[in-house]
Every structure is written in C-alpha cells, then in structure tokens.
A protein has these predicted regions:
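Amphipathic alpha-helical packing segments from all-alpha helical-bundle domains
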Residues: 102-136, 166-170
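Helical hydrophobic small-molecule/effector-binding pocket
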Residues: 75-114, 128
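Short amphipathic alpha-helical segment with a characteristic S/N-K-E followed by hydrophobic residues
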Residues: 12, 27, 50-55
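Amphipathic alpha-helical linker/stalk segments
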Residues: 18, 22, 28, 60-82
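Hydrophobic alpha-helical segments that form the core
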Residues: 128-168
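Short hydrophobic/aromatic patch on the recognition helix
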Residues: 38-48
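Cytosolic nucleotide-binding catalytic cores of signal-transduction proteins
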Residues: 6, 20-24, 47, 119-121, ...
Length: 171
C-alpha cells in the first residue's frame, strides 16, 4: 500500500519533470509544481527543501527501479551483462538525461552511478577506488552520449565501456 506522502512526492517529482519539458528549470516555481501536481502549496515544503531535492528524489526512484529490475548482481562472471542492462535502462530514460543536461543538472546522475557501485564496495568490504573508477567511467560515457545526441545503441555503449575496461582499466 502506497502512503499518501509517497504518492505526493511522486506527483511532485512527475510534475517538475513534466514542467521541465516546457520551461527552463530556473523559471519553474513551487507554485507551478503544485498546480501541475494538483496539490496544496504546503505539500511541497513538507516533502522537499528545494527543486534540487525533488530531482534527487526522482533519480533515486529511477535508480531503485533499475536495481530491482536488473536482478543481475555485479560480479566478475556477468559484468558485461550488467553494464548492458544499465545502458538499456539509461536509454529507456534518456529523456530525463537530456532534460538534466539542458538544465545543467546532469551531475546529479553521477551521484546515482556512485550509489550503485559504492554501496557494492561497502557491502563487499573492498577497495572503493575500483568502484569509483567504474562509476566515473560509466557516467562520463553516458554524459558524452547525451551531449552528442544519443546516437549509439545501449549495446554499442556497453561494448565501448567493456572493451575499454577490459583492455585498459582492469590490468
């Protein structure tokens, strides 16, 4: 059962993303968001400190859905499949990446890449530098892909990353 506050957060985040498709992020007001979401103005303040926090919430939800849907755990036996699954998820949600890029907020995605890999490093009690390397590389490939018009397929992106990682980074 979904709590009302969870539903309100989702409605607020969806409203902000919808507004970003039509209006510059800096020009969107809290009133615009609550009007679009059909919620009272106070609801936004109960749930978020600012618009950046709304974006972070939205991205957290997308990341959580990827983690749940991927069902492929990162390990040395299926790393390539995991990366391909990640790029498929990113391609499926590329409109969000494009919106964040246009609003100069794509850096928030770096935090999500870190969350995926750094949590794994902590759980496994291993050196985090390896996971920061993976996270940074994946983020920068995604950033470059968004910046250049999303021309490659998820499989091409995964192959580029895996080829570089296997031939250069894992030695």
């Amino acid at each position: 059962m979904e709590l009302q506050s969870d539903r309100s957060k989702k409605d607020i985040a969806d409203a902000l993303i919808s507004l970003m498709k039509k209006k510059n992020f800096d020009k969107i007001t809290n009133k615009d968001i609550t009007d679009r979401a059909g919620l009272s103005h106070i609801t936004i303040y109960r749930n978020f400190k600012n618009k950046d926090e709304i974006i972070k919430y939205y991205l957290d939800e997308l990341t959580d859905s990827f983690i749940k849907e991927s069902k492929i755990l990162y390990d040395s036996n299926n790393f390539s499949s995991y990366i391909e699954k990640l790029f498929n998820h990113l391609e499926k949600n590329k409109d969000i990446g494009v919106l964040l890029y246009k609003a100069n907020m794509i850096h928030h995605l770096k935090d999500e890449f870190d969350r995926i890999f750094i949590n794994k490093a902590q759980k496994e009690n291993v050196e985090p530098y390896h996971y920061y390397f993976l996270s940074g590389g994946l983020y920068n490939i995604y950033y470059f892909w968004i910046k250049n018009g999303c021309k490659e397929t998820p499989i091409e992106l995964a192959n580029k990353f895996n080829n570089f990682y296997i031939t250069k980074g894992s030695k």
